[in-house]
């Protein structure tokens, strides 16, 4: 579960390497976010020459969490790190590549471009 002030790795080539969560979108009193939820972040580390600069406020969708997620068949999936992909307002990724596996829950939330770019969907 991701909450305010959580730092996440960025799993795309948009230029950001690490982001800090500012807000969890989806309701006035919402505290935590899981895989497939949208968050507002600020870029804490960025690579030189990237599309996204340090200090920029961006929207991102969570693709991997350490706490994991429960599926409808009763199974759980969890990852070694918390990671996100920076997106535009139309849910398309700002980068052109996705690094590492992503969860199948993104397909249910209509992030088809991220699912198609990912090397592995678990």
UniProtKB/Swiss-Prot annotation:
InterPro entries: Ribosomal_uL14, Ribosomal_uL14_bac-type, Ribosomal_uL14_CS, Ribosomal_uL14_sf. Pfam families: Ribosomal_L14. GO terms for biological process: translation. GO terms for molecular function: large ribosomal subunit rRNA binding; structural constituent of ribosome. The keyword tRNA-binding does not apply. Keywords: Ribonucleoprotein, Ribosomal protein, RNA-binding, rRNA-binding. One of its GO terms (cellular component) is cytosolic large ribosomal subunit. Gene3D superfamilies: Ribosomal protein L14 (2.40.150.20). Belongs to the universal ribosomal protein uL14 family. NCBIfam families: rplN_bact. Binds to 23S rRNA. Forms part of two intersubunit bridges in the 70S ribosome. Part of the 50S ribosomal subunit. Forms a cluster with proteins L3 and L19. In the 70S ribosome, L14 and L19 interact and together make contacts with the 16S rRNA in bridges B5 and B8. This is Large ribosomal subunit protein uL14. It comes from Bacillus pumilus (strain SAFR-032). The lineage of its organism: Bacteria, Bacillati, Bacillota, Bacilli, Bacillales.
């Amino acid at each position: 579960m991701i909450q305010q002030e959580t730092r996440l790795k960025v799993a795309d080539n948009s230029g950001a390497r690490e982001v800090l969560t500012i807000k969890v979108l989806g309701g006035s009193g919402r505290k935590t976010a899981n895989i497939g939820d949208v968050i507002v972040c600020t870029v804490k580390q960025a690579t030189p020459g990237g599309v996204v600069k340090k200090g920029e406020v961006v929207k991102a969708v969570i693709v991997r969490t350490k706490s994991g997620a429960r599926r409808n068949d009763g199974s759980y999936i969890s990852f070694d790190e918390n990671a996100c992909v920076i997106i535009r307002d139309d849910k398309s990724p700002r980068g052109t590549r996705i690094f590492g596996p992503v969860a199948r829950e993104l397909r249910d939330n209509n992030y088809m471009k991220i699912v198609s770019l990912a090397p592995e969907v678990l």
